[in-house]
Amino acid sequence: MSIMVNRKTTAGGLVAAALLFSSTALAQLTEKPPLHGNHWMAVTGKPLAAEAGAQIFQKGGNAIDAACAMLGAVCTMWDVLSWGGETQALIYNPKTGKVIAIDALGYAPTGATPAFFKAKGYNFPPEYGPLAAVTPGTPGGLCYMLAEYGTMSLKEVLAPAMEMARGYAIEAQTANSFEAGKRRLKEWPYSKAIFLPHLGQKREAPEAGEVFVQKDLLETLTKMVEAEQDALKHKKTRKEAIYAAMDRFYK
């Protein structure tokens, strides 16, 4: 980029022109560039989750296998994208030229009626806590995508997430989020036990880089994988076995 400056421009005008050039050039330098890959690409908001997708690609998995692995990993390590939430996905099929939409939204529990909430003193469902939650949609969405459009087993794609649940070095962003929200986390025993391992200390959440363990989540994922593997032992197809894992979670 070049800037034409009139010889009669004042010193102030030159400074303004220079500042304009600097800010514009900086914006161009810091703008996220297009990314390209020869064979595949794995992109998420968390580097470790992107690595999970890369591992699946390197093992011969397709884009859906990698996406499911990244989804599992992100839900394990990002507090605002958890296994208890919901998932939406768009899948482009190059063979048909069509886009498939996956809307894995959770159902409201059958007991979540207006009468139920009014009996507890609420005019509306609360904004936070167990009574605000729907049935988790993410586990079902992941299993459906993998069963219908993937090629690998649930055991393979959940391996990175399960490894993280055993313990990984937590990032500053997530750890600080726990600390900032600790007043609300203390309202629920299980949340307090998992996310605030240093109760009573000045900082009750994990420190950045501390090994963060989620043993209950690991147990849940293990039960799903065990259901899949048991179905495979009984001569079920890959797809049937994944749906058996989904049933293990919901039923």
What are these regions, as identified by a protein language model?
Residues 2-14:
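Bacterial N-terminal signal peptides that target proteins for export
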Residues 6, 26-27:
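Low-complexity, intrinsically disordered segments with a bias for serine/threonine
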